């Protein structure tokens, strides 16, 4: 009779122990599932274009009241996805190709690529090539030091992307994740073959790590467990120190998993984790692209050495100083050319007109006036120019760009000189003054036009202080400075001071419109009217895009 109570007590103890074991297994499974959800959570929300595509593809006929409403709803969802009012035909075609490209990828690989949110097929190719390079590299032997722990943690995080699915759809994925040294073994087998994990004296912790790599956990590995197992002297710590150290590691666990193991710093050096808003999750998911561009220690050292050499050369070579203004130059030729500003020396002389220049490049540009060379051609209208700056100014007539803005009234201009002239309206400045009557003007051209009233042939040029006659003007230019000459229209007897103005005026009577718009065919009497009209086409084209 005494044996039966003992037997019952033993059975009760064994039952309690079994229940405790089942509870432990259940807790570990819950931890694994929670960890899986934590890894997937930051990148799970679909972004704008992807969300619109999913709504379009996921629409079903029963959701609409009838066939007409279903068709209308499909058109609306397709428009929200492809956005034809914003995207060109090429961009819409690229979106369709991207969708099909992602569809033909194997299951696990497709999920990983979609989490990176590629915006074009080229980005998908770059991601796949990067993944192949990372997984085809031979795994280095892990040293015992801190650097080996760090490298192993990062490699383990890359391997967590492989899941233990046995479907036929995942066979190409398994071939892609082939590793040279560890082969295509399961993740927990690979971990147990890493030097440092299979050594004696760590059996308890090895069993703990291996227990978390069951098929139920889908190949996920807790980063802090690997870091703790590899820490030197881990087995010498007592249980209280182990728990304290594990709690400290647990604080940094979420940040390590969410970053996919791409952070290449020790987990114990990480700052406390701050909860990020949802809009920041997308940025975290794209860290892999940025990490791929981070140079290795050797490359970083080489780049730093090159930078230091450049800085030394720049500092050491800037020893040519101008004694007049203190400006320094890297080469003596630059200092020699600069000194001519102070001395007024102009050694380069034009053989055609005798004009002199400080530099040879200025002489080359000037000689194009005599040769008629105009090497810079506008691709839009074919007009040619002798200087690149003139071409840039001209191209703004096609694009409608006006980069120069007045701070006082907000009016914009395509050229800086036009802005300077406009500023004189606000300041009231009139720097050009007539020597005959004292009248002042904002522009030099207005002064010259005014001086024709006085009929003075030796009118002083305000820019050079020389008379027009002393500058060797031609007879045709003298006709513009002589005066006043009256050019009279035979049709309406209106008179003009310039013959060119009379010719432009006569087009009103003849109806001639020689300047035609290539876009719409409309004709104009003046080029300025045509240029102003062409800007309307540019504005419409910009709005349509």
From Swiss-Prot:
Q: Where is the composition biased (Polar residues)?
A: 468-480
Domain named SCAN box is located at 53-135
Q: Which UniProt keywords apply?
A: DNA-binding, Isopeptide bond, Metal-binding, Nucleus, Repeat, Transcription, Transcription regulation, Ubl conjugation, Zinc, Zinc-finger
Recorded hits in Gene3D superfamilies, A to Z, give: 6.10.140.140, Classic Zinc Finger, DNA breaking-rejoining enzymes
Hey, what tissues is this thing expressed in? Expressed in adult heart, brain, placenta, lung and kidney, but not in adult liver and skeletal muscle. In 17-day old embryo, detected in liver, skeletal muscle, brain, heart and small intestine.
What is the superkingdom listed in this entry's lineage?
Eukaryota
Per the UniProt entry, the signal peptide is none
Give the GO biological process terms.
regulation of transcription by RNA polymerase II
Q: Where is the KRAB domain?
A: 221-317
Q: Where is the composition biased (Basic and acidic residues)?
A: 455-467
UniProt-listed InterPro entries = KRAB, KRAB_dom_sf, SCAN_dom, SCAN_sf, Znf_C2H2_sf, Znf_C2H2_type
**Annotated spans, Disordered:** 1-22, 34-55, 455-480
Keyword check for Transcription: yes
Name one molecular function that GO assigns to this entry: zinc ion binding
Does the keyword Nucleus belong to this entry? yes
Which residue spans match zinc fingers labelled C2H2-type?
320-342, 348-370, 376-398, 404-426, 432-454, 487-509, 515-537
* Compartments (UniProt record): Nucleus
Q: Where is this cross-link: Glycyl lysine isopeptide (Lys-Gly) (interchain with G-Cter in SUMO2)?
A: 26, 29, 178, 222
Q: GO terms for CC?
A: nucleoplasm
Family (UniProt): Belongs to the krueppel C2H2-type zinc-finger protein family.
Report the function annotation for this chain.
May be involved in the transcriptional activation of MDM2 and EP300 genes.
Task: Give the protein's recorded name.
Answer: Zinc finger protein with KRAB and SCAN domains 4
């Amino acid at each position: 009779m005494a044996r039966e109570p003992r037997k019952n007590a033993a059975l009760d103890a064994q039952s309690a122990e079994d229940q405790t074991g089942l509870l432990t297994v259940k807790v570990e499974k819950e931890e694994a599932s929670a960890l899986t959800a934590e890894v997937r959570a930051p990148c799970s929300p679909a972004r704008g274009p992807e969300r619109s595509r999913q709504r379009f593809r996921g629409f079903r006929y029963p959701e609409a009241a009838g066939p007409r409403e279903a068709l209308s709803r499909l058109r609306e969802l397709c428009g929200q996805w492809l956005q034809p009012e914003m995207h060109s035909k090429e961009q819409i075609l690229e979106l369709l190709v991207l969708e099909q490209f992602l569809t033909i990828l194997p299951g696990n690989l497709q999920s990983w690529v979609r989490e990176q949110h590629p915006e074009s097929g080229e980005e998908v190719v770059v991601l796949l090539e990067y993944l192949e390079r990372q997984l085809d590299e031979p795994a280095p032997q892990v040293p015992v030091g801190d650097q080996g722990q760090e490298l192993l943690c990062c490699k383990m995080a890359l391997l967590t992307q492989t899941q233990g699915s046995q479907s036929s759809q995942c066979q190409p994925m398994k071939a892609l994740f082939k590793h040279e040294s560890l082969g295509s073994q399961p993740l927990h087998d690979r971990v147990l073959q890493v030097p440092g994990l299979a050594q004696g004296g760590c059996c308890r912790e090895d069993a703990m790590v291996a227990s978390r790599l069951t098929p139920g956990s889908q190949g996920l590995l807790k980063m802090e467990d690997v870091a703790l197992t590899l820490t030197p002297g881990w087995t010498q710590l007592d249980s209280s120190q182990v728990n304290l150290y594990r709690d400290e590691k647990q604080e940094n666990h979420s940040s390590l998993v969410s970053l996919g193991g791409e952070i290449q710093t020790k987990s114990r050096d990480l700052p406390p984790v701050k909860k990020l808003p949802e809009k920041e999750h997308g940025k975290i998911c794209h860290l892999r692209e940025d990490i791929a561009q981070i140079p290795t220690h050797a490359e970083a050292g080489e780049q730093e050495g090159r930078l230091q050499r450049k800085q030394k050369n720049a500092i050491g070579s800037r020893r040519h100083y101008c004694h007049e203004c203190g400006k320094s130059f890297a080469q003596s030729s630059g200092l020699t050319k600069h000194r001519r500003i102070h001395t007024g020396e102009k050694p380069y002389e034009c053989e055609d007109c005798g004009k002199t220049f400080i530099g040879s490049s200025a002489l080359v540009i000037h000689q194009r006036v005599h040769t008629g060379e105009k090497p810079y051609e506008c691709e839009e209208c074919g007009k040619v120019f002798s200087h690149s700056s003139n071409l840039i100014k001209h191209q703004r007539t096609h694009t409608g760009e006006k980069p120069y803005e007045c701070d006082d009234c907000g009016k914009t201009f395509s050229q800086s000189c036009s802005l300077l002239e406009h500023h004189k309206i606000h300041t009231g400045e009139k720097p050009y003054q007539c020597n005959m009557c004292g009248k002042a003007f904002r522009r030099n051209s207005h002064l010259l036009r005014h001086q024709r009233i006085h009929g003075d042939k030796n009118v002083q040029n305000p820019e050079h202080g020389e008379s027009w006659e002393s500058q060797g003007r031609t007879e045709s230019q003298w006709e513009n400075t002589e005066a006043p000459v009256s050019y009279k229209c035979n049709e309406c007897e209106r008179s003009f001071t310039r013959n060119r103005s009379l010719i432009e005026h006569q087009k009103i009577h003849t109806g001639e419109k020689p300047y035609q718009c290539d876009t719409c065919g409309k004709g104009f009497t003046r080029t300025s009217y045509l240029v102003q009209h062409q800007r309307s086409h540019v504005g419409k084209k910009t709005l349509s895009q």
